[in-house]
């Protein structure tokens, strides 16, 4: 797995192709200042669903040829009354296409947003399906998909309102600070499959 540290992502004299990060998905990606990741491209689109990402992923991969893709999608699908199974099916198809292109993938999981408590059970079921998928994809030597368990990570620190904007839905700067830390940490652990808070919860066996 490609490794990265925040220091290593800033100012290193490396070829662009060797440090190419692509951030795709919904408003959580769109609102994330990802410039600290060297040669990164952020094409997040507010309101985007997994079904939207799937419809464009072939063209996106051809255009950007990323080394590492960071994806957020699913919450909007579930809020539009798509089922967990339908949403996961689209997610799985996206990930398979990314892996086939040769890129690694990190999924930033759903959030325990105060505004969407009626969806939280579905969020957890969805994330559980993705975590199982990531475990099944892993081999003895690599984890092509790793998952940051954002939901449980936020719960571990009490899920304070300060993690969110006033709408209690979108992330605040404090919330994104945790995302920055967790993405750097999981990217630096080549054997990690599931990351939670400050440690790897499931690794390659």
Predicted segments — roles?
Residues 100-104, 143:
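A short helix->loop->beta-strand "cap" motif at the edges of active sites that frequently abuts
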Residues 14-22, 200-205:
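N-terminal low-complexity, Pro/Thr/Ser-rich intrinsically disordered segments
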Residues 114-205:
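Catalytic His-Asp segment of secreted/periplasmic serine-dependent ester chemistry enzymes
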Residues 16-93, 114-116, 121:
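Conserved SGNH/GDSL esterase-like catalytic core that processes O-acyl groups on lipids
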Residues 111:
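Carbohydrate-associated surface elements
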Residues 62-65, 101, 190:
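Glycine-rich phosphate-binding loop signature in dinucleotide/nucleotide-binding domains
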Residues 93-101:
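Catalytic-core regions built around general acid/base machinery
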Residues 1-16:
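Secretory targeting signatures
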